[in-house]
Every structure is written in structure tokens, then in C-alpha cells.
Regions:
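Alpha/beta-hydrolase-fold enzymes
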Residues: 4-91
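Residue-level signal for short, function-critical loop segments
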Residues: 12, 137-139
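Active-site nucleophile elbow and catalytic-triad environment of alpha/beta-hydrolase enzymes
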Residues: 87-88, 103-123
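Conserved alpha/beta-hydrolase "acid-adjacent" motif
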Residues: 116, 140-146
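Short, conserved loop/helix-junction motifs that constitute active-site signature segments
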Residues: 124-128, 153-154
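Short beta-strand/loop motif that positions the catalytic acidic residue
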Residues: 127, 133-135
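Catalytic active-site module of serine/aspartate enzymes centered on a nucleophile-bearing elbow/loop
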Residues: 148-149, 156-195
Length: 195
């Protein structure tokens, strides 16, 4: 009743075993850094860089990497994909410390909209807002199948898909597609599911 419109982009009702496994792999990378656990802000930074590199593989996926990280030389001194992973790991280390990232991973794993609300089906069935769900064709974190399941559970909801080689990050890259999906919905116009 308080919310007239709800947009859910590349998400799920609860953490899946797959996403928990991805997060655990990142935690293991952080824990493998011998400095993690020491009482200082820069502890675990090599582990954090490795964890970020692991996470990026799932955010972008094979198609995204194969499209953007091809080597331009026959025998490069450093592969583009390698330097990209290193750069992204170092970049995250400038914004986070390992303890914060570790806590975020733990929080992700506890996500469950049905907890304390009679289960997932009951919680989603109570949504009265006009709801738009947007999935991404190559998202391996929150798959189109999971998004379609949400659509079946939320009364009267609509489902659209962004066609993108960039996996979960597709909604950050495919601005025009996302705008074309969101604009009519936000303006209150009727939309047709594209899937």
C-alpha cells in the first residue's frame, strides 16, 4: 500500500547455494592471506584483491571477458585479462578493507525475504505494488530462471530481460535497454513482457 511501483533488477528472493558457494570462495581467498585477522586496516589486502578477481568472473562471465579482454598482440607481455583482474583487485583495495568486504559477503549469504514472514511464497504473495522484474540473459549470479520464478510468485508482476554478454553487470552496461524497459513502467504505461 505504501509502494505503488517496485522494480527488481537482477536479484533473487534468497541467497542460493550457488551464490553462497561463490561468496565462500571469496572468503577463502581473504582468509588465505596470512595478514587477515591482524588488528590493522590493511590486513588481508592481497586476499581481498584475489576475492575481487574471483567475484568479477561471476559478475561478467565468459562472454563478457571474451568480448572485452582479447589480447591484441600474438604474444603479449601481459594478457589483458590478467592485468584487468589485477587492476580490479587493486582498485577495490583502495575503496574497501578486507574486513568490510568479508562482512558484506556474510550479509549477502543471509538474504532471505521469507525469513520471519512465513516463507518465501507467503512473503512474495503479499506484494501489492505493480512490480517489474528485469533479468539478464547471461547472469550467472541471479539467473533468468530465478527471475522468472519471482515473477510467478509476485502477483501481477511483469518480467523483462536485458540481452547482454556482460552477465550480472549487464544492467550497468546496457543503459539503453534498461531505460527502454524502465521508462514506460515508471510512467505508468502498460508494458508487454519481452519473455
Amino acid at each position: 500500500e505504501r509502494i505503488a511501483r517496485l522494480v527488481l533488477i537482477a536479484t533473487a528472493a534468497k541467497a542460493s547455494p550457488w551464490t553462497i558457494a561463490i561468496d565462500e570462495t571469496q572468503r577463502m581467498a581473504i582468509e588465505a592471506d596470512a595478514t587477515f585477522g591482524q588488528p590493522r586496516n590493511d590486513a588481508g589486502m592481497k586476499g581481498l584483491a584475489a576475492a575481487r578477481a574471483i567475484g568479477l568472473l561471476t559478475y561478467r562471465g565468459a562472454a563478457g571477458y571474451n568480448l572485452t579482454q582479447q589480447d591484441r598482440e600474438e604474444l603479449p607481455a601481459a594478457h589483458r585479462a590478467s592485468t584487468y583482474q589485477q587492476y580490479q583487485g587493486e582498485k577495490l583495495c583502495r575503496r574497501y578493507n578486507a574486513y568490510s568486504y568479508y562482512a558484506i559477503l556474510n550479509a549477502f549469504d543471509t538474504h532471505d525475504v521469507g525469513r520471519g514472514r512465513g516463507g518465501t511464497d507467503a512473503a512474495l504473495a503479499r506484494i501489492a505494488a505493480r512490480t517489474l522484474l528485469v533479468g539478464i540473459t547471461t547472469d550467472m549470479i541471479f539467473t533468468p530462471a530465478e527471475m522468472r520464478a519471482l515473477q510467478r510468485q509476485i502477483p501481477g508482476s511483469e518480467y523483462h530481460e536485458i540481452d547482454s554478454p556482460f552477465g550480472h553487470d549487464g544492467f550497468l552496461v546496457e543503459h539503453e535497454q534498461l531505460n527502454d524497459i524502465l521508462r514506460p513502467f515508471m510512467e505508468g504505461q502498460p508494458t508487454e513482457n519481452n519473455n
